[in-house]
Amino acid sequence: MVVAVYPGTFDPLTRGHEDLVRRASSIFDTLVVGVADSRNKKPFFTLEERLDIAHEVLGHYPNVQVMSFKGLLKDFVRSNNARVIVRGLRAVSDFEYEFQMAGMNRYLLPDVETMFMTPSDQYQFISGTIVREIAQLGGDVSKFVFPSVEQWLKEKVAALDPANGASAAQP
């Protein structure tokens, strides 16, 4: 049985993420979606919210497990007996960082492979950062996220600044 881990912050989980999960889950016996704590990134959604979103969107895949992790990816990979780390590459700009991470992971986990997957054409430009910015500015994100995620975004934006629906960090 081949287990793969697809780690990420998933802040929020987008249609691009789901596209990779759908495709990777057809390759591996088990795909573990690892939602990283990533406190140093100061995520828009809490870890618990990101887990809830991932369960909502990915819960129908029978061989996909969603769980959180803190600390080193290598420890999470080992604890799940994974043989592969799945990473998405949207553009050349992603490659340099992902290549360095794959090299470090190979050093730390010599028996684990990193598999890069490119998104389907319609999702190549989607990123959680861009989706959050559009949502915070009142734009339509329905083409980039699932309806439940769009609702989570609207509620979070409204909670941050109920007066105008924009981020509380904006003046």
Curated annotation (Swiss-Prot):
GO biological process, one term: coenzyme A biosynthetic process
Keywords: ATP-binding, Coenzyme A biosynthesis, Cytoplasm, Magnesium, Nucleotide-binding, Nucleotidyltransferase, Transferase
Gene Ontology CC terms: cytoplasm
Residues of the site described as Transition state stabilizer: 17
Main location: cytoplasm
Assembly and interaction partners: Homohexamer.
Function: Reversibly transfers an adenylyl group from ATP to 4'-phosphopantetheine, yielding dephospho-CoA (dPCoA) and pyrophosphate.
Protein name as it appears in the record: Phosphopantetheine adenylyltransferase
Organism of derivation: Paraburkholderia xenovorans (strain LB400)
